[in-house]
Amino acid sequence: MSNHTPFYEKFVKQPAKPRAAGRDESQSRKEKTPQQTASAAMPPPVRRTDRRNVAYRFGTPVFAPLTAEAKNILDHFPDILAQVLPLDSQKKQQLPQHIQTLFHELTDERSSRKTHYLNNPVKLSAYTHYYVWWNLVRLVKLLNNIELPLKNGDYAADFGSGPLTFICALWIAKPELRTKALTWYCVDISHKALSFGEELFLALCAYTGKTGKRAGTAETPWRIKKVCGAFGIPLNEKLALVTEANMFNEVFWNSPLSLDEQADKTRELLMRYLQPQGAVLLIEPGIPLAGEFLSLVRAELLQEGFAAVQPCPHGQLCCFPNRDTRDRAAGVPIAVHKWCHFTFETEDSPQNLLKLSEAAHLGKARASLSFIFCSADKDAERNPAPTTLAGSDNTQPASHAQYPLPASRAAERRTVQQQSTQQQSGIPVRICSDIIMPAPQTLGRYACSEKGFLLLTTPAHKDSVLNTAVSGTLLMVPEAAIQISHRDKKTHAVLVPLE
């Protein structure tokens, strides 16, 4: 594959303060030192298809493997798209070049790019055939492991909706929601993109209605209310859920407000929109500025009484704020200039999408994102977990991760999970980095926990949990293993040795 830097990983705003000494602290693979990447010091290589959670895992990872139905839909996305936006042979031939041109407008030439670029037919075609397709893959893998609080009659809103990418991803990822009577406010500054998106969504519904019929079910397309406007525009109904995907990435680069001011404004608007027990799902590119912004919004929502449901395994200070906010007086370990983001490898993505990406010189082996899911419902379930105990021989690997259960079984599962957690007397931690080598023959992964910023370590061998765990894995670590005074000298993370 091409090594061309993907859009969401290339466009990185420089931090105001210089980075801390020791570049090996970075989470990015390309910033690792030769010592870290030396093959002689690494354990035997593990194939990408073998990198999965093992029995030590407790809880579901951030990303789920694509289900058979989801993979089929994503493989046939060009056919669904062709019903709304047919391309003749000449336009198909020009598509890779148009994608490459749009990529440069969204990155290198961003300052000169028009805000309403999706009103341009050529750019809309390039955007939907490349960015929408990739975003569907990202979102479907993420949404499979998030249990959204939606019921019959609910109103929800997706801001920066564009061609309804999030709505389409949710329809693909959550077949159990297809029978619910939901109304979605889809808000965007481009009316043409919204109209196009509604047609695309209906074409998707027609496709799943033909290929995914299940006994005793009747899929009904959700009611779409298109709203031409920006985040903050008044809506008629209070919302059970507010979502956005990549909207703020279009806003805060050119906003006169600081990130802190933008986060405060976001909190204020969210509180206007939501019902008392409403929830918020914000998804952004996996870049430092987006991670920093989401960390600030999370802090604002926690002050309003929200629970940080995912990906956070705790409701304390964010461990990855992408700034130096260590509370030295309290001794809380916080990462310096590291941000919360998660990656997945793309080998199970549609092959035609991978080929199109290569043709546009935008091939990628991995994709990433940052997100927060917060709920005002105190009973909201944080980090769904398997019903088997961590370390049990029956614990499922990531390739067979459990998907959200029907509502009728939700209470039963929560009870089992609470009992499981109590029996283990452990601390849930979320792996938030690639593999590093903090010492010879030692593997390390940075992690988030209620105890703060952690550096998990194991001996460097092929079957090490840190070598096999995927990004976003949730582990259950014995509380006795976390000694706050045992710190890494460079990063000040709490050192946690695992077997």
What residue spans do the PLM features occupy?
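S-adenosyl-L-methionine
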Residues: F196-L235
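Class I SAM-dependent methyltransferase Rossmann-like catalytic core
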Residues: R113-N144
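A short SAM/SAH-binding and catalytic strip from SAM-dependent methyltransferases
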Residues: A240-L259
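Conserved beta-strand signature within the Rossmann-like core of class I S-adenosyl-L-methionine
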Residues: P276-E284
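N-terminal auxiliary segments of SAM/dcSAM-dependent transferases
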Residues: N3-R23, R29-S111
